[in-house]
Amino acid sequence: MEMASAFTLNVRLDNIAIITIDVPGEKMNTLKAEFASQVRAIIKQIRENKELRGVVFVSAKPDNFIAGADINMIGNCKTAQEAEVLARQGQQLMAEIHALPIPVIAAIHGACLGGGLELALACHGRVCTDDPKTVLGLPEVQLGLLPGSGGTQRLPRLIGVSTALEMILTGKQLRAKQAVKLGLVDDVVPHSILLEAAVELAKQDRPSSRPLPVRERILAGPLGRALLFKMVGKKTEHKTQGNYPATERILEVVETGLAQGTSSGYDAEARAFGELAMTPQSQALRNIFFASTDVKKDPGSDAPPAPLNSVGILGGGLMGGGIAYVTACKAGLPVRIKDINPRGINHALKYSWDQLEGKVRRRHLKASERDKQLALISGTTDYCGFAHRDLIIEAVFENLELKQQMVAEVEQNCATHTIFASNTSSLPIGDIAAHAARPEQVIGLHFFSPVEKMPLVEIIPHASTSAQTIATTVKLAKKQGKTPIVVRDKAGFYVNRILAPYINEAIRMLTEGERIEHIDAALVKFGFPVGPIQLLDEVGIDTGTKIMPVLEAAYGERFSAPANVVSSILNDDRKGRKNGRGFYLYGQKGCKSKKQVDPAIYPLIGAQGQGRLSAPQVAERCVMLMLNEAVRCLDEQVIRSVRDGDIGAVFGIGFPPFLGGPFRYIDSLGAGEVVAIMQRLATQYGSRFTPCDRLVEMSERGESFWKTTATDLQ
């Protein structure tokens, strides 16, 4: 049976050809290799029809133009040469579109990303809608790749090299107003008149390129170019720590095109695309993409979720305010906040106001839309308005008796179907539900701070939690824009459990004489966004260390922190950034000076700060403990799969994405190598480095956690 075409041609009475993009059976339009013949057949028809005045590409999907190329095409390539051929085929197709003798216009609504933007760049003009769904970008770098269908050559010539480099190197997505300001699109119109606006543009002569600003023209010349690429290269190296080869190749390819012409540029682009597709970094990043997509499709349980019409939140503090924001402004659900103090309610309301007002200032949101979203949030000091809430999220202090009291109050003041979700980071959910009348409706819903930025949530059912409660909570998390993983109700859950030994080891090295900045720099060089000591300062030393005694009580000596170090720091009223006193010095608000270690910290904990370990040795000690604990979590069924373990670590604590997560990283090293490293470290530093039984068994059998495919498990 012949597959329905993703590209169809219709000619209007005014002799404008409309090419409609609609990939059959898919929510999103993505470009596949087999579509090339369909497009070429349409191009042939257009060339043969001498009466045509112009061409318009438009999508039939309600919220996307083209979301990019099908990533599976890259995974199917076995060699760099095969991936290079794929890129050259894309380049050739775009060149054929651009070579049409009549104006070709892209009518863009919704996501126009990757290969979709490259197709739009191959057109002679672009019109997009003013809808918030409309975004344009080249996010290939986030998959360890570069744009392979001409994007590295066309974009710098259209909007200027410095602006293009920023887009390509970061994967930054532009909204409509930004795109028209930079010259990426020719016009921005309401969705209702998109097609007509594009048709009118197609009836004119080919749109002439807008002259680049003087600055961009200078930067494209030999002298300006040399300075620009040196500066951008240095900045990029500092940001990536040399862990992402795609950024270096992007700079090389763009510069080649500007210095030697487009022919050399296209050649360099295709070659670099092929080579990058085979790098372990790209393979790991693509695996993370597939795994996160898979997690987002996972309903959490087989039961159907209950309806979600409104949510209540207990506590208007930092976490409560953040949860209220994502519930109202991302999920679009009415939120009622209860706090015993009106100031708590005001704090939560101001939290959402600050987030939304920032969007208004950046022109990402209209003031009227801000007011509409804020109207979804209300507050109370009692349970007025809570009677019919479908789900209550508790975000009060980490105190078991208090949380048990909250369960009792919710059961007394809310409907019998109301779910109670605790945002605890350390207390067992089973204990919180111990006296509940309806324990099947009690569950953990652990957000990470800052709530609006951190993508992960842990969903923690206890032994009596119902399947429907799990499914409903997963549904809410997804509506809030989060990536949820379901974890077992054991001390520390998953993320904090694997994070604690990592931070403990950093503190232990600090007491042994390693410098704070050396420890942090070593882990940043390894690939973490911040080092473990700085992370402790950022989350709050009191908050970050509160869970350590809980974990030590549950799992024993391997979770013990260096004696008296944490208490010495806390007794000196050091809580980190939040009170301006931590491991680092904090100047006045708004001060942009380079962060500096507080030298008073060393005598406080009886350390010298001399240091003798290399950066790789520092990173090895912290990371190996994290890997070992992640495997234990899998063995104890704290996580349901290695997929969840990798996603939880990458999205929850910033485990280096280019390594693919703890389990992908173990596979890349080999279980045997990991066991050998840990046995060496155990001999040097103690039994906490003893590899767990599962790792030893896998080492002996030569097993790995993942199969070679992106989503299958052993």
Swiss-Prot record:
Keywords linked to the UniProt accession: Cytoplasm, Fatty acid metabolism, Isomerase, Lipid degradation, Lipid metabolism, Lyase, Multifunctional enzyme, NAD, Oxidoreductase
GO MF annotation: an example: NAD+ binding
Main location: cytoplasm
EC number in record: 4.2.1.17, 5.1.2.3, 1.1.1.35
PROSITE patterns: 3HCDH
Protein's UniProt keywords contain tRNA processing: no
Gene3D superfamilies: 1.10.1040.50, 2-enoyl-CoA Hydratase, Chain A, domain 1, NAD(P)-binding Rossmann-like Domain
Function (record text): Catalyzes the formation of a hydroxyacyl-CoA by addition of water on enoyl-CoA. Also exhibits 3-hydroxyacyl-CoA epimerase and 3-hydroxyacyl-CoA dehydrogenase activities.
Subunit and interaction comment: Heterotetramer of two alpha chains (FadJ) and two beta chains (FadI).
HAMAP family tied to this protein: FadJ
UniProt name for this protein: Fatty acid oxidation complex subunit alpha
Organism encoding this protein: Escherichia coli O45:K1 (strain S88 / ExPEC)
Upper classification of the organism: Bacteria, Pseudomonadati, Pseudomonadota, Gammaproteobacteria, Enterobacterales
